[in-house]
C-alpha cells in the first residue's frame, strides 16, 4: 500500500467515532492480582537482588517479581486505579511480609516471605537458599562483598526492569523475534551491571518478561504507566537514568498509533507507534498538530519535544504501513511540496534530516513508490546522483 493512499481525514473520522462511544468494557485479570504497596518495596528489591547474585540463576519468575517491584514503586492504590481505568475488573490481593518455617537438613529455619498469590512461599525460600550459596562463594573469593555487588543494593529492581523496557518495544511482533535485539542492547547498556552480577543473564530475564506480558496483558498497562511515572521523576540512580532512556525510546514512538489510517488508542500499541500519512508536508504538519492537541501522554512524546531527534532512517521502514511520523516529514521534503510550511521548525528538521540521509548515501529510493514528479522534486531539492535513484 502506497503512503499516498492513506488519508489523514480517515484517521480523524475514526478518532471521532471512538471518542463518541458511550460504553466501556470490563476485562478480567484473573482470580486475584497481587498489589504490593510501598512498605514491601525493599523486600521485593532484595528478592530481585537475590536472583542477580545467584550464579546460573533460574529466571522463570524474574519477570513476575520485577513487575511486583514496579507495582510497589507505584503503590497499591495507583496500581489498582491504572487497571480499573484500563477496563480491568480487579480483585486485589494485599501483600504483607510474614515468617515462613522450612526444614533444611533436619533443622528448622525461618525465612521472611511475602504473602503473594502469584508466587508461593516455597519458591521465594528457594530463591533465597540458592542466593545464599552464591553469596558464600563470593565471600570466599572477595573476602568482603562491596555494597554494589550485594543482593540488597538499592538498584537491583531497576536493573531487572531495564530489560523489561527493552522487551516492551518488541511485543508488537506477536512473537519473540526481537529477542536477539533485546539481548544485544542489554549487553551494551547494562555492561557495568553485568560485571557486578553473575545472575544478570539478559536472555533468560527477557524471556521471563515475554512470558509475563503474554500471559498477563494487564501488566503491560501497569508497566507503561510505571515507566511514565519513573521517567518523569527527577533525580535517582544511574540505573534509573538508563531505564528512563530505554523506556522513553519506546514510549516516544507514539502511544497513539496511526497505521493504515486506523487509530488504535491503547497503551499496548506504544511499541507499534508508527504513523502512515500522506506523503506531503501539509499532511505531516496536520499529524504533528494533531499530536499536539492530544498531548504528550497520548503519544509522539519525543516528536513534540524534539522533532529532529525523531526523524529515523527511511530505509528501516520499507513498508509504508510502518513509516513513523518523522520519516513522513523527511519524505515530505523529498516529495513534491509547494507553499510555505505551517510549522517551520518541523520543516527545517525534516529538511536537515533528508539532506543528511543524502550526504550519507543511505536513501533507497526504490522503496518510496515515487511519481515522476516526486523524483524530479528530489533532484531539485537534494541533487542526488543518478545511481542513487533506484527504480
From Swiss-Prot:
Tyrosine phosphorylation modulates viral transcription and replication. The keyword Coiled coil does not apply. GO terms for molecular function: protein serine/threonine kinase inhibitor activity; RNA binding. The modification Phosphotyrosine is found at residue 38. Its main location: virion. Residues 31-252, 244-290, 338-364 are annotated as: Interaction with the phosphoprotein. It is found in: Virion; Host cytoplasm. It comes from the Viruses. Signal peptide: none annotated. Keywords: Capsid protein, Helical capsid protein, Host cytoplasm, Host-virus interaction, Inhibition of host innate immune response by virus, Inhibition of host interferon signaling pathway by virus, Inhibition of host MAVS by virus, Inhibition of host MDA5 by virus, Inhibition of host NF-kappa-B by virus, Inhibition of host PKR by virus, Inhibition of host RLR pathway by virus, Interferon antiviral system evasion, Phosphoprotein, Ribonucleoprotein, RNA-binding, Viral immunoevasion, Viral nucleoprotein, Virion. One of its GO terms (biological process) is symbiont-mediated suppression of host PKR/eIFalpha signaling. GO terms for cellular component: helical viral capsid; host cell cytoplasm; ribonucleoprotein complex; viral nucleocapsid. Homomultimerizes to form the nucleocapsid. Binds to viral genomic RNA. Interacts (via N-terminus) with the phosphoprotein P (via C-terminus); the phosphorylated phosphoprotein P binds to N-RNA complex. When in a monomeric RNA-free form, interacts with the phosphoprotein (via N-terminus). Interacts with protein M2-1; this interaction allows the association of nucleocapsid with the matrix protein. Interacts with host EIF2AK2/PKR; this interaction inhibits EIF2AK2 phosphorylation of EIF2S1 and blocks EIF2AK2-mediated translation shutoff. Belongs to the paramyxoviruses nucleocapsid family. Encapsidates the viral RNA genome by forming a left-handed helical nucleocapsid that protects the RNA from nucleases. RNA replication depends on the availability of soluble nucleoprotein. The encapsidated genomic RNA is termed the NC and serves as template for transcription and replication. Together with the phosphoprotein, sequesters host NF-kappa-B in inclusion bodies (IBs) thereby inhibiting this host defense pathway. May also act as a modulator of the innate immune response by sequestration of host IFIH1/MDA5 and MAVS into IBs. This is Nucleoprotein. It comes from Human respiratory syncytial virus B (strain B1).
Amino acid at each position: 500500500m502506497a503512503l499516498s493512499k492513506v488519508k489523514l481525514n480517515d484517521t480523524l473520522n475514526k478518532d471521532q467515532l471512538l471518542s463518541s462511544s458511550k460504553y466501556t468494557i470490563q476485562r478480567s485479570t484473573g482470580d486475584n492480582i497481587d498489589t504490593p504497596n510501598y512498605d514491601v518495596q525493599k523486600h521485593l528489591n532484595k528478592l530481585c537482588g537475590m536472583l542477580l547474585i545467584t550464579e546460573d540463576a533460574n529466571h522463570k519468575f524474574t519477570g513476575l517479581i520485577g513487575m511486583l517491584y514496579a507495582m510497589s514503586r507505584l503503590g497499591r492504590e495507583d496500581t489498582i486505579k491504572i487497571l480499573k481505568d484500563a477496563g480491568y475488573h480487579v480483585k486485589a490481593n494485599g501483600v504483607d511480609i510474614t515468617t515462613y518455617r522450612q526444614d533444611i537438613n533436619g533443622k528448622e529455619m525461618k525465612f521472611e516471605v511475602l504473602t503473594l498469590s502469584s508466587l508461593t512461599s516455597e519458591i521465594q525460600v528457594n530463591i533465597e537458599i540458592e542466593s545464599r550459596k552464591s553469596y558464600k562463594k563470593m565471600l570466599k573469593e572477595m573476602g568482603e562483598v562491596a555494597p554494589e555487588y550485594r543482593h540488597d543494593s538499592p538498584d537491583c529492581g531497576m536493573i531487572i526492569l531495564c530489560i523489561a523496557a527493552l522487551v516492551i518495544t518488541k511485543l508488537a511482533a506477536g512473537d519473540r523475534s526481537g529477542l536477539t535485539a533485546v539481548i544485544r542492547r542489554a549487553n551494551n547498556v547494562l555492561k557495568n551491571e553485568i560485571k557486578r552480577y553473575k545472575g544478570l543473564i539478559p536472555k533468560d530475564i527477557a524471556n521471563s518478561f515475554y512470558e509475563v506480558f503474554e500471559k498477563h496483558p494487564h501488566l503491560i498497562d501497569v508497566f507503561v504507566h510505571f515507566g511514565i511515572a519513573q521517567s518523569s521523576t527527577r533525580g535517582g540512580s544511574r540505573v534509573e537514568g538508563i531505564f528512563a532512556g530505554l523506556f522513553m525510546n519506546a514510549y516516544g514512538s507514539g502511544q497513539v498509533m496511526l497505521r493504515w489510517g486506523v487509530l488504535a488508542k491503547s497503551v499496548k500499541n506504544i511499541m507499534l507507534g508508527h504513523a502512515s500519512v500522506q506523503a506531503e508536508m501539509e499532511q505531516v504538519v496536520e499529524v504533528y498538530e494533531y499530536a499536539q492537541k492530544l498531548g504528550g501522554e497520548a503519544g509522539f512524546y519525543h516528536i513534540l519535544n524534539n522533532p529532529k531527534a525523531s526523524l529515523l532512517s527511511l530505509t528501516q521502514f520499507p513498508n509504508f504501513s510502518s513509516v513513523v511520523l518523522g520519516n513522513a516529514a523527511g519524505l515530505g521534503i523529498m516529495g513534491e511540496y509547494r507553499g510555505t510550511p505551517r510549522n517551520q521548525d518541523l520543516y527545517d528538521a525534516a529538511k536537515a534530516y533528508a539532506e543528511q540521509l543524502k550526504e550519507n548515501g543511505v536513501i533507497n529510493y526504490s522503496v518510496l513508490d515515487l511519481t515522476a514528479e516526486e523524483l524530479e522534486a528530489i533532484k531539485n531539492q537534494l541533487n542526488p546522483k543518478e545511481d542513487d535513484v533506484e527504480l
